[in-house]
């Protein structure tokens, strides 16, 4: 395992730990999810470039499309919640009422 792979795995781990530890605001959770998706995209791109498998070239692009959809849905949910409740605290949201 090269140093680049270790750094990308460390970035994913730090983003995951940030998602698990700092769950107070929805915006910080969304940023941690974007960090995880970015590290997964870079890792998938490096795997495709190292394997020279032509059918797997679309995998990082599909992952990037899913990351963009996740970001758009997350930001629209953040705007809706902040307009409705006036705050974005995750602890105060009840899933049965939203």
Curated annotation (Swiss-Prot):
UniProt subcellular location: Mitochondrion inner membrane
Catalyzed reactions per annotation: a ubiquinone + NADH + 5 H(+)(in) = a ubiquinol + NAD(+) + 4 H(+)(out)
Family recorded in the similarity comment: Belongs to the complex I subunit 4L family.
PANTHER family to which the protein is assigned, alphabetical: NADH-UBIQUINONE OXIDOREDUCTASE CHAIN 4L, NADH-UBIQUINONE OXIDOREDUCTASE SUBUNIT ND4L
Principal location: mitochondrion
Transmembrane regions: 1-21, 29-49, 61-81
EC number(s) on file: 7.1.1.2
Membrane topology: Multi-pass membrane protein
GO cellular component: mitochondrial inner membrane; respiratory chain complex I
One of the record's GO molecular function terms: NADH dehydrogenase (ubiquinone) activity
Keyword Electron transport (UniProt): yes
Biological-process GO terms, alphabetical: ATP synthesis coupled electron transport
Protein name: NADH-ubiquinone oxidoreductase chain 4L
UniProt keywords, alphabetically: Electron transport, Membrane, Mitochondrion, Mitochondrion inner membrane, NAD, Respiratory chain, Translocase, Transmembrane, Transmembrane helix, Transport, Ubiquinone
Function of the molecule: Core subunit of the mitochondrial membrane respiratory chain NADH dehydrogenase (Complex I) which catalyzes electron transfer from NADH through the respiratory chain, using ubiquinone as an electron acceptor. Part of the enzyme membrane arm which is embedded in the lipid bilayer and involved in proton translocation.
Subunit structure and binding partners: Core subunit of respiratory chain NADH dehydrogenase (Complex I) which is composed of 45 different subunits.
Keyword flag Transport: yes
Domain of life, source organism: Eukaryota
């Amino acid at each position: 395992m090269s140093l680049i792979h270790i750094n990308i795995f460390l970035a994913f781990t730090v983003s995951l730990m940030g998602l698990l530890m700092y769950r107070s605001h929805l915006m910080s959770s969304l940023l941690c999810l974007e960090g995880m998706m970015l590290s997964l995209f870079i890792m998938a791109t490096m795997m495709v470039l190292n394997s020279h498998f032509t059918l797997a070239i679309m995998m990082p692009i599909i992952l990037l499309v899913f990351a963009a959809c996740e970001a758009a849905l997350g930001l629209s949910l953040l705007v809706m919640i902040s307009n409705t409740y006036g705050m974005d605290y995750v602890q105060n949201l009840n899933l049965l009422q939203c």
